[in-house]
Design a protein with these regions (language model features):
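Short, ordered, surface-exposed loop/turn motifs in non-cytosolic proteins
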Residues: 35-72, 93-95
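Generic marker of residues within folded, mature protein domains
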Residues: 18-20, 34-38, 79, 91, ...
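Residue-level recognition of well-ordered beta-strand positions that form the cores
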Residues: 29-31, 47, 102-104
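Structured interaction patches on ligand/partner-binding surfaces of diverse proteins
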Residues: 94-132
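Beta-strand-rich domain onsets/edges
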Residues: 10-40, 123-132
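Solvent-exposed serine/threonine-rich low-complexity stretches and specific carbohydrate-binding patches
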Residues: 59-83, 114-119
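Short Pro-Gly-centered beta-turn/loop motif in secreted/extracellular proteins
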Residues: 72, 79-100
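Sec-dependent bacterial lipoprotein signal peptides
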Residues: 1-12
Length: 132
């Protein structure tokens, strides 16, 4: 019984030595579905907005290059990425605040997917599949 208490207390002490980091990884996979199956969208675009949730941008209009507009108020993405022929889009985010991610399909023009992640969500993994 004493050994169990000792192991538990040592574990807690070790945990306190790990520095907190504002970095977290994000990995996004974008696909599209057609009559022939599901395929990787190799030219998809991903836009990341720090400090907002998707509910914060209800009513905004989506413009080219990930710009969001509401009555002349514009929000531009903090990060712009393209799949560039890769199956997934992976990056290291330099902070741990809430984020919203908008993914734009290159296969289905004008189609976007949107999701948000809370500060504690780590690592971030998102799979977006656009259909007909």
């Amino acid at each position: 019984m004493a050994l169990l208490a000792l192991l538990c207390s040592c574990h807690d002490e070790d945990k306190g030595d790990i520095p907190q980091s504002d970095e977290r990884t994000a990995d996004f996979i974008v696909k599209y579905k057609d009559d022939f199956g599901i395929h990787t969208d190799y030219k998809a675009k991903v836009y990341i907005y720090y400090g907002i949730y998707s509910m914060d941008i209800v009513g905004f209009h989506y413009l080219p290059d990930g710009v969001l507009d509401y009555g002349g108020k514009e929000i531009t993405p903090d990060i712009r990425l393209s799949a560039d022929g890769k199956e997934d889009i992976t990056l290291l985010l330099d902070n741990a605040e809430k984020i919203t991610v908008i993914v734009e399909s290159s296969y289905y023009e004008g189609r976007v997917g949107i999701t948000s992640y809370s500060p504690g969500d780590t690592p971030i993994k998102g799979i977006f599949t656009f259909g007909e």
